[in-house]
A protein has these predicted regions:
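C-terminal structured interaction module
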Residues: 136-142
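Hydrophobic secondary-structure block in the mid-to-C-terminal portion of proteins
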Residues: 35-44, 54-57, 63-67
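Active-site glycine- and acidic-residue-rich loops that bind
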Residues: 20, 47-62, 142-147
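Active-site pocket-lining/capping segments in soluble small-molecule metabolic enzymes
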Residues: 1-34, 64-129, 142-145, 155-174
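Conserved strand-turn element in the central/C-terminal portion of the radical SAM core barrel
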Residues: 44-52, 74, 137
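Short, surface-exposed connector motifs at secondary-structure boundaries
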Residues: 37-45, 129-136
Length: 174
């Protein structure tokens, strides 16, 4: 554009926000979308991290239903200890995902032992193959930048297998 900006990312709230009502979120998202259309802006929705793909997929379906045709860049927690993920989750207010973890003790056990949410990544990858607004993702390197980069490089280079919806790197991250 005129000032050197090619794309604009705005906050997407698949799990709502503790500070803003859902009605207000929806109202302003629609206004931003309409403005982007009238001004021919490349707008994308960028989400917070979460631990459960279900509410995110439902949120995307709601966007499609309302004809809010914006690409979505999903926030994904990189490999980290369960304690670290829980602490960041509590600070960030990703409440629905934290409740999901509390109710699904096997997921908690998985996170305690392998420190990455492979099942959710598999669900998001499957969903991105459909006619969905999910176009990209970005990582939150809570467990450290180096570990997250290594993990991403192993996935990008194909150095993994998928067993029972879980990604197994050929080499350990830690």
């Amino acid at each position: 554009g005129q000032h050197g900006f090619e794309n604009i990312g705005i906050a997407g709230h698949p799990e709502g926000s503790p500070d803003i009502t859902q009605e207000t979120i929806n109202e302003f998202l629609l206004k931003k979308f309409e403005l982007s259309q009238s001004q021919n802006l490349n707008l994308e929705l960028v989400t917070q991290f979460f631990f459960d793909a279900g509410p995110f997929i439902k949120w995307c379906a709601n966007l499609v239903q309302k004809n809010i045709n914006l690409p979505v860049r999903v926030g994904f927690p990189g490999p980290a200890s369960f304690k670290t993920l829980l602490n960041f989750g509590m600070m960030s207010g990703v409440g629905n995902s934290l409740n999901f973890l509390k109710k699904n003790s096997t997921k908690v056990t998985d996170l305690l032992t392998k420190t990455s949410n492979d099942e959710m990544l598999s669900q998001l990858a499957d969903y991105s193959l459909e006619e969905s607004p999910l176009k990209a993702f970005h990582c939150f390197p809570f467990g450290g930048f180096e570990k997250t980069c290594y993990w991403l490089n192993e996935i990008q280079s194909g150095e993994f297998t998928i067993e029972n919806q879980k990604i197994k790197l050929h080499k350990k991250v830690f």
